[in-house]
Amino acid sequence: MRRSSVTNRQSLLPLRVQDANRMGLTTPQSKDRQGFGKLSMSKPHSGTSERKTSFFGKRMSNGTARTSQYGAFGGTEKIKDPRPLHDKAFIQQCIRQLCEFLNENGYSQTLTVKSLQGPSTKDFLKIFAFIYTFICPNYENPESKFEEEIPRIFKELGYPFALSKSSMYTVGAPHTWPQIVAALVWLIDCVKLCCVLRSENPVFEEPQMGEQSENGIDFNQLFLDYTVRCYDQFMEGRDTFEEYDADMCIRLKEAYHVDESNLEALQQESRRLLEEIERLEKEKENEPDRLASMRKLKVSLQADIQKYQNYLTEIESHSTLLEQRVSSVSEDLEATELESRAVQQENLRLKNILDNQKYSVADIERIKYEENELQQTIAKLTKDLDEDKQQLWSEELKYAKMKESVETQLSEFHKIGRKVRLIPPTAEYANGYDFQIQCNLDSEQSSLIHYRNKINVPLVEILSQSEGQIAGATNKKMGVEDMVEQLNTLIGEKKNEVKVQKDEAQKLEETYQQKVEEAEEDEKRWISEIESLEKHRQLLESGVNKSLDEALKDLQKEQQELQLVEHQTEEEMRQVENKLVRVVHAVANHVAVIEKHLEEKRLKVEREYEEFMKEDLLLDLRELLDKYKEKARVLDSPPY
């Protein structure tokens, strides 16, 4: 609802009485807007009375032209400075502009932004004199009363804001320097404008018809002519310009080659876009929690990203471990190659000795026989060695897989323990027990048995406590569900009551609107009757002078009767309006009280439900119990 400007109550209709004292840039219209219940009556205006106040000053209603072209624009009212002088960023920007201008134009001293944070009065006078010499080259600082001279110069240049004398004594003060530096920046803008005006470029050359200016706006001489003609008529006392508007529309259509056949296509496109907007709004209404669901999806994806990052970290650590193993195997391989080379050299040496010796045939046969036996023995041993190596490699693979599986299970156990707040010992549900397993898998297997015996007893104790908590939470949940069901039933009943009250309020609103329309029709009818009577009076004055007195008496009588009827109608409408307003206010207050009560109930139920959901650990405890049982089975299984 909108609040009326006449009374402090909430109006049921849009605001009809506008602020008559606020000046606007639009052309004033001839009709006076009046509030509801006030029948418009034409009041006779004297030839010298003031009718309206325009943006440019007072305008007489007798049709005579104004003596002044522009009027009292703004008067002597003090203009409020719209610049953010209390904003540090704005002041620093002004200081930078001042520093850049002085340094670029050859100021006698090299200035920095820091040195201009709070200059002295002497430095300010030098800076002002340097800038002002661009406008007045013969200017010199006054020897005395500079506090009066400088504000006077700014005023003569047209600076719209006043500079006090006291500010000239404390130029560098924190409360004064922002106003001074803003004035200096304005003076710099004046200097730049003067430099542009002194140049030979035709800056203010009038653009041609249809030409585009620098800021992208099309210049239109037709609109300028239309504005001049309308303003001339406005200053002569006219308030409507229908003939100029029609002529302007025709000229614009001819100038821009408007094809009226395309209007229907544009209207269809507009309707299509409106339907698209309605469809999107319906989709938005059908999916009110889409943002919440997307946020939940975002949180879930972030959790998945964190899991993948943890997995990558584990993979990197495992890769580092494999690299260490590869390096150790490479070292063993190099050592074995060195031994093989030494054995080959020894064989070559022995073979050389064998070739140089002289043996008998029996010795050669015996040596060949022994050589064959040794070769068979070597082949058998080599085969056994290969089998042992293959078996050792398979055992190492099994051990590595088993170790990796155990490490994965340990990391998963630690992750679940942190998730359910059992790790570290200071966690919420740890009860001082240390459930973290820190064992060396390369050592004896008795450490796993030790940790299994260490963890089983506290876990059994925590499981027994959890079962009791689950039973209590289940009972509490059932009670809360019953309460929520009762509250939902109550809310449904209250919603039905609110719907009935809203229907009644809608009917009253329709009745009220009907009464308003009837009153407006009566008002229009009375206005037409008054206009016809006025025309009849004018005809009687021009045609028949003898019956003037009788016509005036009849007119006065008719006006009295009309005023009486208007007064009676106004009183009746006021009474009807008051009754309707009281009824609608009562209904609105009742609806507001019911909505407030329902909102309080809803908030209370939501708070209780949120508190219950925070305490609802049934699902988490069941998952925890299943995981504990699974881990217990793993720990109870015999180690490899």
UniProtKB/Swiss-Prot annotation:
Residues 1-11, 61-70 have a biased composition (Polar residues). GO terms for cellular component: kinetochore; Ndc80 complex; nucleus. Component of the NDC80 complex, which is composed of ndc80, cdca1, spbc24 and spbc25. The NDC80 complex interacts with mis12 and zwint. Interacts with cep57r. It is found in: Nucleus; Chromosome, Centromere, Kinetochore. This is Kinetochore protein NDC80 homolog. Residues 1-79 are annotated as: Disordered. Keywords: Cell cycle, Cell division, Centromere, Chromosome, Coiled coil, Kinetochore, Mitosis, Nucleus. The keyword RNA-binding does not apply. The keyword Magnesium does not apply. It comes from Xenopus tropicalis. Its main location: nucleus. GO terms for molecular function: kinetochore adaptor activity; microtubule binding. It comes from the Eukaryota. InterPro entries: DUF5595 (IPR040967), Kinetochore_Ndc80 (IPR005550), Ndc80_CH (IPR055260), Ndc80_sf (IPR038273). Belongs to the NDC80/HEC1 family. Acts as a component of the essential kinetochore-associated NDC80 complex, which is required for chromosome segregation and spindle checkpoint activity. Required for kinetochore integrity and the organization of stable microtubule binding sites in the outer plate of the kinetochore. The NDC80 complex synergistically enhances the affinity of the SKA1 complex for microtubules and may allow the NDC80 complex to track depolymerizing microtubules. May play a role in chromosome congression and may be essential for the end-on attachment of the kinetochores to spindle microtubules. Pfam families: DUF5595, Ndc80_HEC, NDC80_loop. GO terms for biological process: attachment of mitotic spindle microtubules to kinetochore; cell division; chromosome segregation; metaphase chromosome alignment; mitotic spindle organization; positive regulation of mitotic cell cycle spindle assembly checkpoint. Residues 249-394, 467-636 form a coiled coil.
